[in-house]
C-alpha cells in the first residue's frame, strides 16, 4: 500500500517498513494471552527492530493499525521516537466513542472483530478475499485499480493471517482500551512533534 511513498522517502532517508506482528511476513503468535497483540507489545516490537538495525532514535509514521502502534510507541518510548505521524485512525478510546448510528457502519469490521474468539475468525475465514478485498476497493480512492499482482499478494497475506488480524483488532477493544484509559487518566501526553492526517469518510 505504501510502496511508492517508501521509495520516494528512501531517496534521502533510511526507511524501515516492517509488517506488524500478525501481518504479512511477520510472526503470528497464537494463544490466550491478551497482550500478544496489544499495541504496547507491537510498539515494543517496532522499537526492538529499529534498535537491532542500529537506530536508537527515529521518526515514526503509521497508517491505520500502524498509527495505533506508532501512537503507543510515542507514549511508551518517548526517548526513542523523535517525531510522530499518525494517519487515518482515531485513538483507541475515541474509536469506540465517536461512531454513532448508521454512520458507524463504515467501521462494521471493528465491532465484528471485537467479539470473543470463534465467530469473527469463522466468518472472515469463510470468504477472506471478499472481506479484505472490500477494504482494498473502498480505500483505493482512485478510478484505476490496484495492480492485480499487488492485490493478489495483499489478499494472500491476509488470507494466511485471519486469526492474528482478528486478535489485533480484538486487542483494540480490550487490553488497548485499558492501557489508553490508564494513560489518559494519568495525563500522559506525546512530547515529540506530532502530525495527524485524517481523511473524510
Residue ranges and their predicted role:
Residues 1-6:
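The serine-hydrolase catalytic nucleophile loop
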Residues 7-9, 188:
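A generic structural signal for short, solvent-exposed coil/turn residues
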Amino acid at each position: 500500500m505504501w510502496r511508492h511513498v517508501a521509495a520516494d522517502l528512501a531517496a534521502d532517508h533510511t526507511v524501515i517498513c516492517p509488517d506488524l506482528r500478525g501481518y504479512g511476513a511477520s510472526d503470528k503468535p497464537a494463544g490466550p494471552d491478551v497482550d500478544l497483540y496489544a499495541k504496547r507489545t507491537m510498539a515494543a516490537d517496532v522499537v526492538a527492530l529499529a534498535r537491532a538495525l542500529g537506530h536508537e532514535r527515529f521518526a515514526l509514521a503509521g497508517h491505520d493499525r500502524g498509527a495505533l502502534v506508532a501512537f503507543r510507541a510515542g507514549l511508551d518510548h518517548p526517548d526513542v521516537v523523535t517525531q510522530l505521524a499518525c494517519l487515518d485512525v482515531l485513538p483507541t478510546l475515541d474509536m469506540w466513542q465517536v461512531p454513532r448510528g448508521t454512520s458507524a457502519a463504515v467501521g462494521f469490521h471493528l465491532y465484528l472483530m471485537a467479539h470473543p474468539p470463534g465467530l469473527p475468525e469463522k466468518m472472515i475465514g469463510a470468504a477472506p478475499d471478499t472481506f479484505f478485498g472490500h477494504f482494498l476497493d473502498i480505500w483505493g480512492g482512485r478510478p484505476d485499480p490496484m495492480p492485480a499482482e499487488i492485490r493478489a499478494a495483499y489478499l494472500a497475506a491476509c488470507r494466511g493471517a485471519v486469526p492474528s488480524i482478528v486478535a489485533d483488532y480484538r486487542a483494540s477493544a480490550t487490553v488497548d482500551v485499558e492501557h489508553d484509559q490508564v494513560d489518559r487518566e494519568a495525563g500522559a501526553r506525546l512530547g515529540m512533534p506530532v502530525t495527524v492526517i485524517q481523511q473524510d469518510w
